Amino acid sequence: MTQVAKKILVTCALPYANGSIHLGHMLEHIQADVWVRYQRMRGHEVNFICADDAHGTPIMLKAQQLGITPEQMIAEMSKEHQTDFAGFNISYDNYHSTHSDENRVLSELIYTRLKENGFIKNRTISQLYDPEKGMFLPDRFVKGTCPKCKSPDQYGDNCEVCGATYSPTELIEPKSVVSGATPVMRDSEHFFFDLPSFSEMLQAWTRSGALQEQVANKMQEWFESGLQQWDISRDAPYFGFEIPNAPGKYFYVWLDAPIGYMGSFKNLCDKRGDTVSFDEYWKKDSDAELYHVIGKDIVYFHSLFWPAMLEGSGFRKPTNLFVHGYVTVNGAKMSKSRGTFIKASTWLNHFDADSLRYYYAAKLSSRIDDIDLNLEDFVQRVNADIVNKVVNLASRNAGFIAKRFDGELAAELADPALYQTFTDAAAVIGEAWESREFGKAIREIMALADLANRYVDEQAPWVVAKQEGRDADLQAICSMGINLFRVLMTYLKPVLPELCARAEAFLNVELTWDGVNAPLLGHKVNSFKALYNRIEMKQVEALVEASKEEVKAAAAPVTGELAENPIQETITFDDFAKIDLRVALIENAEFVDGSDKLLRLTLDLDGEKRNVFSGIRSAYPDPQALIGRLTVMVANLAPRKMRFGISEGMVMAAGPGGKDIFLLSPDSGAKPGQQVK
């Protein structure tokens, strides 16, 4: 190994924990994984980490809609996300969550250092407030009519029709997306990060030459328009970390989200019992390399706020950002109605992971270009390249080696010059992997595959096999073909981990980057089994149809009682524990003079009598029928003075009202006074 081993930390953008992973996400995670696998093959110390981005208003509100706690929701999402990434063989060393002890400690540390260094400012701002939900509204949680083009139903920050940007206060007839209420303006003290103080440092970082040209150019535009102070706080209710010494104020999700990179790495170090590496990687003068693989939509946060936060709190800055474009399918934005908004899990029900990994790699470069997943081209390319060119090379030769030579390869290379051509290509292909010019690497490898297949075509082992006295030639030709296959698979190992594992089992040797310098001579291979099957358009059709069906299922309207009476906001166990429910015997029931809705119930709690007024008369026109029944009551409800007397509790009933009211009754065996738990 001539290279000096490097210490490298690689991250992907943290998936938001309120939805499933789809093929747009997978572009980034595949791109990063291919680069990481190549670095590992070259002997570098690589730590590859990620986490779920688990904070913010959308998560809080979605959990409420589902009737579960945010903690429950993000735990379920984390399991789903990790299953999807494992299915695509994304080789993370650690996958964590921003809702973690490590992230809380680091977020508070960075904030405290920024505050101590004078980079946190306080000021009062006016925001739209939902009076029904009792919460301030983020821009995307306000909708109204665009103030520019007058298009209805537009978000509070920009119009999707005319493209205009504006303040949510400029919307015409704004409404809260959460409750439908008309928001009002309210003042609140917020905390701001003084980003303009870091303008000079950020411009120097931009000019260093490390960033992609397109990123540097975009940053220059932001510098010219002037950097603004960044609001890093949000008001309760909010799911996130409370700001130290600021009750009711929480860190904005974009403050603690990138710190999640540090939190995940700290968690990994702690799991390993490693007390040294975290500081080695994150200290200001660290010689480790730090790379963030991200989409072009979050460059602003990663190229401005994040390095400035790190600089201001005494940590190192990223070595570079690797930015990619978006994914389109069949030349258009992913569409749920067309079945091209495809979840990662749905893909894996119809295709293997290697097929998408290969197709994305074949199209990726170091530029920030959008990638189109053309499903017809996908089928053709996978079959033409992986099946016809690479796998076919092994299958054309393996049978002869197994049947005629008991799996043993020849002792010498049939064409050393051709083999040298293949091994010499390692420099060009390696540089392409290194510089993230994946498409170029694939083109170079497929050009070699064409050479290998041309060699086999010219040598025609199927003809030689029929000629007497040419066993040595047959063994040499087929051994040459298998050795060339081994080189190709070695170069493809960062992209095709599943296929390469099967190839290693057949070749009876591990595929290592430097290993190709020594061909397999006199080496015994194992029996050949089909390495990869052709894919068909009917699989694509099934995939698209399955995606459509998933959308229909997800969009199915809620019917029945939940539609009429949605589950209310989540409460804590402590809140529930305050309610004292007891079994009660209805000792007497009678009409209430002057009321056509109420019945007066005398309830026996086995030693204590309660007088309760209940609005159940419409369902029980004969109150005498209730006498002697057991029911359930709220025993610690504060007494309520009514026109007819004092009500000392509440009986429990179900139903929408009118005649459809159903008094709850405990199962047989329950006794008056027993607590309902």
From Swiss-Prot:
This protein's record includes keyword tRNA-binding: yes
InterPro entries membership: aa-tRNA-synth_I_CS, Anticodon_Met, Met-tRNA-synth_bsu_C, Met-tRNA_ligase_1, Met-tRNA_synth, Methionyl/Leucyl_tRNA_Synth, MetRS_core, MetRS_Zn
Intervals of motif 'HIGH' region: 15-25
Family annotation (PROSITE patterns): AA_TRNA_LIGASE_I, TRBD
Binding site for ATP: K336
GO BP term, pick one: methionyl-tRNA aminoacylation
Gene Ontology molecular function: ATP binding; metal ion binding; methionine-tRNA ligase activity; tRNA binding
Catalyzed reactions: tRNA(Met) + L-methionine + ATP = L-methionyl-tRNA(Met) + AMP + diphosphate
Start and end residues of each tRNA-binding domain: 575-677
Cofactor note: Binds 1 zinc ion per subunit.
Cofactor: Zn(2+)
Record's protein name: Methionine--tRNA ligase
Organism: Cronobacter sakazakii (strain ATCC BAA-894) (Enterobacter sakazakii)
